[in-house]
Amino acid sequence: MNHKWNYRPITPEQAETSQTLAQELGISPILGQLLVQRGITKAAAAKKFFRPQLPALHDPFLMKDMDIAVERLNRAMGKKERILIYGDYDVDGTTAVALVYKFIQQFYSNLDYYIPDRYNEGYGISKKGVDYAAETGVGLIIVLDCGIKAVEEITYAKEKGIDFIICDHHVPDDVLPPAVAILNAKRLDNTYPYTHLSGCGVGFKFMQAFAISNGIEFHHLIPLLDIVAVSIASDIVPIMGENRILAYHGLKQLNSNPSIGMKAIIDVCGLSEKEITVSDIVFKIGPRINASGRIQNGKEAVDLLTEKDFSIALEKAGQINQYNETRKDLDKSMTEEANNIVANLEGLADRRSIVLYNEEWHKGVIGIVASRLTEVYYRPAVVLTRTDDMATGSARSVSGFDVYKAIEHCRDLLENFGGHTYAAGLSMKVENVNAFTKRFEEYVSQHILPEQTSAVIEIDAEIDFRDISSKFFSDLKKFNPFGPDNTKPIFCTHHVYDYGTSKVVGRDQEHIKLELVDNKSNNVMNGIAFGQSSHVRYIKTKRSFDICYTIEENTHKRGEVQLQIEDIKPIE
C-alpha cells in the first residue's frame, strides 16, 4: 500500500509560540509544537493537559435538564419506586448501565437493569423492554447510550405510567421524546460546555450530580472511573477536554485498583503484568465486552461488570472470552467474503462508497466488517443483513467524512437510523436497498474530498534521531492517553540507512527488525516495521530511505526506546 505523507502545517506564529511554550515548560521545541497543534498555547493549559485534575470536571448541573433528572431520581427513591437501568448492547451502553446500577445500588435496592436483545429487539428502546418494565412494576427508567430518537416507544411507556430519564450522546432529531429529562450535550438548546462525552460519560455526570444533591463525597465516584475509561476508548470519542480527565484517571484506576469485573477481564486478556493503555482497551478489553452483545446478550457483560465475587467474575469473563473467539471466526469469514464481493464490483475505481447486503450475514459482526472495508478501500462503507423483513446494518466512515449526514440524506428510504460522524446504525425495507445504495453513493461522491479516499499518514514533526533523548521520551509520555483529537504523534526522519543487522522476523517472515543510522546525526535507533518485509531487499543495499514512525517503549526490554515504523519510502 502506497501511503501519502501529509505534514501537519505550522505557521510562523505557531512556531514562535511553540518555542516560547517549550522554554517555559522546559521541554523540547518539538513537543512544544505538538502542544500547539493540539490547540494548547499557554503554559498553564499545558500543565493541565499533562496532569489532568478531577476538580477541573465541569459542574454536572450545567447540563440541560440535569436538575430535573436528579429531582426525579430522588423522588423515585423517596417513594420506593422500582427503577430500571436500560442501555444499549455495545461497550458504551453496557458500561453505562453497569456504572449507574453499581452507584445507585449502594444507596437503594429496588433496582434492576435491562439490555435489549440485538436479534429479537434491535437497537435502542423496545416495546418489549417497556412491557417488561410495566410487568415488573417499574415507575422510572433511566436509559443510557440510546433513546434520543425513541419518541414512539417513550410515548408508549408514558401511557403505561412509566417515566424516562434519557442519558444519550447521539445526534437528536428536531422532535425530542416526551421524557421527564433528556441529558444530551448534542441538544440544540444545549447549555453544557463539552459536547463529546460518551454515553457512559453522560451516565457518570448524572451520578456526579446525584451525589452532589445528596451530599455524597466525590471520592465515592472514583471506583467507577475504570468503567468510564473503557467506554471512552471503545466508543472512539475525542480524548481531549473532559474526556481526557476521565480517561486519564480511569486508566489510573484500571491499572491500580480495577473493579472485580474489570480485573477478571484484564486477567483473561493476559494484561495483568503490564500497564494498560487506550490501545489495550480498544483491541483487547473492549472487543470482549462487545462480544457479549454481538454473539449472545449484552446483559452478560453487565452481569460481569457488576459482579462482586472474583471467582464468579472469572467464570463470566471466560465465557465472554469464548464469545470473542466466536466473533473473531465470524469476523474473518465475513470479511473475506465481503472483500471478494468488493473486488468484483463493477466500476469499483469510480465508486466513492461501498454498500453490501447479504441476508445470511451475522448481525452481530456487520459493524466490524464495515470498519474493515473502510480500512482497506478508504471509502465510507455500509454493511447490511436481513432481520425478519428488514435490511439492518452498520455504517463506518473514513477520516473527515460525516457518514451520519450521508445517511440522514437518505432518511425517506429508512425506517430507523442513528449514530455519530464516523459510525451509524440503520434499517430499511429490503426493497429499498438498491435505491439507498444509489442515493448514498450520489451523496458521498458529491461531498467527499479526494484526499479522504486515499491512504494518508499525518506526520506531526520531522526530527533527527539525536532529538530522541530519554528526557524527550519521558516528556512525550505525558501526552498519554492518546486517542481522537490527541493521536499518538507520528514523526519522520529522512535519509536513514541500515546499520547492517536488520532482518526479517515473524512466523510468516512479514516483519522487519531494524537497526538504523540517521545520516544527519549518525545516531543509531532500533525499530520494528510490521508487515513491511517487502522493503528488506532495498534496505540491505545500504542505500538511504525515509521513515515515519511512533516512538515506543520496547516491551521486551523495559526502559529501552524503539521506533514502530509506520511506513518506509526508498529514495529513488
PLM regions with names:
Residues 119-121, 150, 170-175, 189-191, ...:
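Short gly/pro/ser/thr-enriched loop/turn and capping motifs at secondary-structure boundaries
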Residues 75-79, 312-318, 322-356, 409-572:
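Mid-to-C-terminal polyanion-binding domains and interfaces
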Residues 152-156, 369:
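A short acidic, amphipathic alpha-helical/loop segment
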Residues 2, 10-140, 160-161, 211-435, ...:
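Hydrophobic helix-and-loop "lid/oligomerization" segment in the mid-to-C-terminal part
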Residues 150-151, 235:
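Intrinsically disordered, low-complexity regulatory tails of plant transcription factors
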Residues 114, 144, 167-169, 183-185, ...:
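Generic beta-sheet signal
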Residues 75, 171-184, 516-521:
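Acidic-glycine-rich active-site phosphate/pyrophosphate-binding loop
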Residues 99, 175-216, 221-233:
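Short alpha-helices
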